[in-house]
Amino acid sequence: MQALVNKIWYQGHPLRWLLLPLSWLFAVITYVRRALFRLGIKSQTAMPVPVIVVGNITVGGSGKTPTVIYLIELLRQHGFTPGVISRGYGVDIQGVRTVNLGASAVEVGDEPAMIVARTQVPMVVGAKRVDAANALIAEFGVDVIICDDGLQHYALGRDIELVVIDGQRGLGNGLLLPAGPLREGAWRLDAVDFIVNNGGPAAKGQFEMQLAPTEVKPVKCDLTSGEYSFDKSQPLVAMAGIGNPARFFESLRAQGYQLALCQGFDDHQPYDKTQLRDLAQDLPLLMTEKDAVKCRDFAQENWWYLAVNAKLSPQFDEQLLARLREVAAAKQGNFHGIR
């Protein structure tokens, strides 16, 4: 099914025209919903601290999670105490839930588990972002909230909107769901504060981001750096359960890894030991960091993951920090802006 969807959205498959009437209906629904918030008919809750929403206008992965991790580290370097909220995709959460270090993807979602494992940032997940944000402030006293996804969750007031675009796939065929991959029309990009292009080239007004690979690490957590080594010249099986698996495989080939087999999975797909053991056979299995957090409880010693770090320009850092300081000063002056 996912292969057919990708053909419709990104390769010009003629089935998109049959779905177009549904896209028109979706356009009306999304426009009316946003208008209700802008007109004040539906309420939007402002937070007492700045809120940065990191999202996209397309379905599927675009590089939001590496961007969130980048922002966490950037803000810490400049004296802020950030916290993160998220929906916790695929997890049935009643109320809100704090993401503790070592929490499983089954409990909190794969991306929250990965973010906390990497950064140890204060994080709360919940279906209602407003409740998650209030819990984050009450429990941890953060001075900036980063909302992982949630661009279309207008009940949460936001001060800075940052959209991440997949530089390879762009906006696909430019159509709204279900005929295309768009959650909102391309016009929405004109209303956000920052557009980050993952993989570039960045258009005017956008900031290019590159994902730089780090060292290969074992999925098993009980191995330390002195107890393992990885030979990238050996044949291996690569797997990726992310929005654009091809990007991961292309990156591995460019780095000189010898890929005997590449297996893409749906984003957020759960795994089990037998499934992946049968996939790898006796070869090393190399996966993304987001996949690794779902496999640690049953990982084999020859299962590995490759993490990436987002790289953005100093100009991006300067502009985002300047905007954030403006917002923080206004909040301290008892100004609560709702956009």
UniProtKB/Swiss-Prot annotation:
Pathway given in the UniProt record: Glycolipid biosynthesis; lipid IV(A) biosynthesis; lipid IV(A) from (3R)-3-hydroxytetradecanoyl-[acyl-carrier-protein] and UDP-N-acetyl-alpha-D-glucosamine: step 6/6
Decide whether keyword Secreted is in the record: no
Q: Which UniProt keywords apply?
A: ATP-binding, Kinase, Lipid A biosynthesis, Lipid biosynthesis, Lipid metabolism, Nucleotide-binding, Transferase
Please give a single GO biological process term from the UniProt record: lipopolysaccharide core region biosynthetic process
Q: Which GO terms describe its cellular component?
A: plasma membrane
Tell me one GO molecular function of this protein. Answer: ATP binding
Give its E.C. classification number.
2.7.1.130
**Which of this chain's residues are annotated to bind ATP?**
58-65
- Per the record, a Pfam family? LpxK
The protein's matches in InterPro entries, at most eight in alphabetical order, are given as: LpxK (IPR003758), P-loop_NTPase (IPR027417)
Q: Which domain of life is it from?
A: Bacteria
Tell me what reaction this enzyme catalyses: a lipid A disaccharide + ATP = a lipid IVA + ADP + H(+)
Name the family the entry cites: Belongs to the LpxK family.
Known NCBIfam families for this protein?
lpxK
Query: What does this protein's UniProt record list under function?
Result: Transfers the gamma-phosphate of ATP to the 4'-position of a tetraacyldisaccharide 1-phosphate intermediate (termed DS-1-P) to form tetraacyldisaccharide 1,4'-bis-phosphate (lipid IVA).
Q: What is this protein called?
A: Tetraacyldisaccharide 4'-kinase
Q: Which gene encodes it?
A: lpxK
